[in-house]
């Protein structure tokens, strides 16, 4: 195990950025989101949750898939280049690390999404344990340990800096790259104390009593026609804020854009909460807010576990708890349906 001081952290980040793209929490106008490192970036490793998750690193909000050009009556198709160089994602919280596993189930199942797969192959994830969990956190509900982040490299906040531990071969290679800024040290006691403090705080969170009894594999018939869906969905605005801030939502649309010199076919995030989501000539899209609202939460808590060995499509990050203008989030749904211990 190694230690990196707060004073040396900027040098370490600069060293990484010199060798590869570096994606990390950056503050801009008081708002912290993941962005690319630059020399004048206001790096923020203290804010617990970025407004948006680091999902963009592997599943961008918008990306070109291929382009079509026509010259002299000849049409050419040029696929977008796949990621072929290593890059690092720094300061990822344990819930967001688990979210990558959820996305893997979607994009790496056969036939694998080549764009996502290339990014996953070359991406190096450096996680950071949650020194001070917030009231909106409920990751423990889904079996996530905020004190034990799973990634290529795991970090914990300790006195005067951070403990650093490589967990995978990719993590070890990154460690070798920045070894000049690390001090090898036995931090077992300090890290264990930090883990215990984090777990104690998590147990005190307002949503630590959530129970998933009645959800999960095989619960479709039990939950689908529950009259509470109507009561809950009546307050939903269908704004889609929850889906765009969620680290596990994977819905997207594919569109064509005429540049005047050719056509780009691109993929962009979409929301199952929108009335025109998956709209087709046959009219198969869900026509009511009740249907759309139910679909979102049934997918996360029933359908996804049904098809993915019991894995839920929620990681308890709490972003929807904080962002929904109606305070109508997955915690409220679970509780209203009886999900408390």
For the regions a language model picked out, list residue spans one by one:
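Short alpha-helical basic/polar micro-motif
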Residues: 93, 240, 244, 322
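Iron-sulfur-associated redox domains of electron-transfer enzymes in respiratory
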Residues: 1-219
């Amino acid at each position: 195990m190694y230690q990196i001081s707060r004073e040396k952290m900027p040098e370490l980040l600069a060293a990484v950025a010199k060798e590869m793209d570096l994606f990390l929490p950056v503050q801009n106008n008081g708002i912290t989101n993941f962005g690319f490192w630059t020399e004048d970036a206001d790096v923020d490793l203290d804010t617990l949750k970025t407004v948006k998750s680091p999902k963009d690193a592997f599943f961008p909000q918008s990306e070109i898939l291929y382009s079509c050009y026509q010259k002299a009556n000849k049409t050419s198709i040029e696929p977008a280049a796949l990621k072929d160089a290593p890059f690092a994602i720094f300061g990822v919280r344990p819930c967001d690390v688990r979210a990558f596993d959820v996305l893997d189930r979607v994009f790496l199942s056969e036939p694998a999404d080549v764009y996502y797969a290339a990014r996953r192959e070359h991406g190096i994830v450096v996680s950071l344990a949650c020194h001070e969990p917030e009231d909106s956190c409920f990751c423990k509900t889904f079996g996530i340990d905020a004190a034990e982040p799973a990634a290529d490299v795991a970090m914990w906040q300790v006195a005067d800096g951070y403990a650093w531990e490589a967990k995978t071969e990719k993590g070890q290679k990154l460690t070798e790259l920045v070894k000049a800024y690390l001090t090898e040290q036995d931090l077992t006691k300090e890290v264990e104390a930090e883990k215990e403090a984090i777990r104690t705080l998590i147990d005190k969170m307002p949503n630590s009593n959530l129970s998933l009894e009645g959800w999960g594999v095989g619960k479709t018939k039990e939950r689908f026609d529950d009259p509470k869906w109507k009561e809950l969905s009546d307050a939903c605005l269908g704004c889609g804020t929850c889906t765009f801030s969620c680290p596990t939502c994977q819905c997207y649309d594919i569109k064509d854009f005429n540049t005047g010199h050719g056509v780009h076919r691109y993929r962009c995030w979409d929301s199952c909460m929108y009335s025109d989501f998956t709209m087709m000539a046959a009219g198969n899209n869900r026509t009511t807010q009740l249907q759309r609202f139910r679909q979102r939460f049934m997918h996360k808590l029933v359908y996804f576990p049904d098809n993915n060995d019991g894995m839920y499509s929620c990681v308890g990050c709490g972003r929807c708890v904080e962002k929904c203008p109606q305070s109508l989030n997955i915690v409220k749904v679970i509780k209203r349906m009886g999900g408390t211990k």
